[in-house]
Amino acid sequence: MAFFEGIKMTGGYGKGPDIINDCSVDVNRGEIVSILGPNGAGKSTVMKAMLGLLNLKSGSVVINGKDISKLSPQDRVREGISFVPQTKNVFVGMSVEENLEMGAYLRDDNYQNIIEEIYDLFPILREKKDQLVGELSGGQRQQVALGRALMIKPTVLMLDEPTAGVSPIVMDELFDHIIKVKRTNVAILMVEQNAKQALNI
């Protein structure tokens, strides 16, 4: 049994047709699994189903042996699942550090040590911690989004097309950072269109 699993999932949006049908995905801690396919193939839908943003007609989602199929997306975050959407979802009018702090909304402890760990993973963020995110490059904004997702100390990190809209050089750098995160024993589930890049990691 894998650490994080979507098992025989079937479902769609509202009363519309099923977008995923009998789909299974699994990933273990310290592993990266990429969901590959062309636009419109349902890759992001699979991820949304595992996060609880899509109602399943059948199938289940399990983390560390616990069935979380009936949990809300917020409760799934409390179970250790973090998500970075394709839109990056950063607050451009706030500083880097303020963006990271927004990721700590579920924490009731002192999270400054976690911010320091994130700065160790993404050194450029320490250098620019007081700078507005709107002034950063696309690759740096993606690092902010990744860092914010790590503020809850997740066991599972889901990334929806993390390299969308960035240059090949920035893409390589982002994948290097994703590999660093994997080495911290996080299970990473990633939607990616670039098969070559996905297979390289």
PLM region descriptions:
Residues 2-201:
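Glycine-rich phosphate-binding loops of nucleotide-dependent enzymes
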